[in-house]
Amino acid sequence: MSWIPFKIGQPKKQIVSKTVERDFEREYGKLQQLEEQTKRLQKDMKKSTDADLAMSKSAVKISQDLLSNPLCEQDQDFLHMVTALDTAMKRMDAFNQEKVNQIQKTVIEPLKKFSSIFPSLNMAVKRREQALQDYGRLQAKVEKYEEKEKTGPVLAKLHQAREELRPVREDFEAKNKQLLDEMPRFYGSRLDYFQPSFESLIRAQVIYYSEMHKIFGDLTQQLDQPGHSDEQRERENETKLSELRALSIVADD
């Protein structure tokens, strides 16, 4: 004869309908997905702004290194070109810093604040689950006495069990109703909450790249040499490189 395990303290009577439990799991599942997506977006936005700042800071560092290059002491044209580049890179870095500050304030911080709500929500769900377990345990206790022979002591214990069950059942039903009412409202509020942030993100990017267009347009006008195409510059570089390789100090043994 095989032994069939059973759950201790579980009621035979279904205390929560499958429809209610299915609705609860669906709504909570949507919020769990929203929590994960919000945290991932916050993390990706932080990585993006950090990378943007690193890029513009590196560009300024390169232009500063070029300014300290000995070539600038000997060639005024080169000095003029590098000075123009350095000015452009500093302007780019300044606008980039403004963009990052704006995104931090209007996008990343709201994402962070929104994410901070989920621990309280998850705790409310845990309290609901604990209330459900208590409800099930006491319901099973009532059923146990209901199945016994109705003697005086049994009826007394049955009455006591029912009295213990009533507030626990009411507590679960209140928690369950509150979550079923408020979880869809919380999920639906995400659109109104995040729309201003995403609009601000788009505006910050548009302003930044509009300024970059102006900055690099000005730089192009300062650096362009009429009559020199990219192919001509490449040929000139190759010619000069060949001359350097022909020097005896760099010739192969």
Swiss-Prot record:
Keywords linked to the UniProt accession: Cell cycle, Cell division, Coiled coil, Cytoplasm, Cytoskeleton, Septation
Identification of the protein by name: Bridging integrator 3
Basic and acidic residues composition-biased segments: 227-241
Record GO biological process: actin cortical patch localization; cell division; endocytosis; myoblast migration involved in skeletal muscle regeneration; protein localization; regulation of lamellipodium assembly; skeletal muscle fiber development; skeletal muscle tissue regeneration
UniProt key word tRNA processing: no
Name of encoding gene: Bin3
Species classification: Eukaryota, Metazoa, Chordata, Craniata, Vertebrata
SMART domains: BAR
Residue ranges that the Swiss-Prot or TrEMBL entry lists as coiled coil: 16-57, 120-151
InterPro entries, sorted: AH/BAR_dom_sf, BAR_dom, BIN3/RVS161-like, Bin3_BAR
Organism: Mus musculus
Positions of the UniProt region annotated as Disordered: 222-241
Role played: Involved in cytokinesis and septation where it has a role in the localization of F-actin.
Entry annotated with the keyword Cell membrane: no
Gene Ontology cellular-component annotations: actin cytoskeleton; cytoplasm
Main location, first listed in the record: cytoplasm
BAR domain location: 9-232
Subcellular compartments: Cytoplasm, Cytoskeleton
